[in-house]
């Protein structure tokens, strides 16, 4: 069965194992998620569990949103997402960090940091041109393609806005779970800025 929870990225730190091994970790604060709706094939066409995370003031919610969360006897939520392959939950149930254990392998999804308008060297990792005095270009994108089509093909790697994309990093290891603080420590880095929404769920491609 799939495990899943929504959380907020706090930042990065480091811990040491009993043997003295140094491990960089990302701190994820995941307060209990509330099950707002259980979707079924009969009513919705597919099976999923809808959960809400991070309370918000009622004045910021409209009437339909208030009625939706009222079925679960909870406050309006800032973030609402769905998880598939989660069974045995009812509306109003809570998902906490206690479902995870140290050593679990998970996939982490977040929104990458926005970098603004960037050139091809930073955005796509292309090499720069010669920096000599006679060089015709230094940081430009280079050839636009052959003459014959009289146009630039789609998906040509050019300058543009970088970052702000939905990114999933697979097969990250949970190093430690601290239930009393609703905190999960994940080995390595995860996408997103501090205080951004993070989705944690069981790894799809984990070694069995």
From Swiss-Prot:
It comes from the Bacteria. It holds the Pfam family Ribosomal_L3. GO terms for biological process: translation. Residues 116-148 are annotated as: Disordered. One of its GO terms (molecular function) is rRNA binding. InterPro entries: Ribosomal_uL3, Ribosomal_uL3_bac/org-type, Ribosomal_uL3_CS, Transl_B-barrel_sf. SUPFAM superfamilies: Translation proteins. One of its GO terms (cellular component) is cytosolic large ribosomal subunit. Belongs to the universal ribosomal protein uL3 family. One of the primary rRNA binding proteins, it binds directly near the 3'-end of the 23S rRNA, where it nucleates assembly of the 50S subunit. Part of the 50S ribosomal subunit. Forms a cluster with proteins L14 and L19. This is Large ribosomal subunit protein uL3. The gene is rplC.
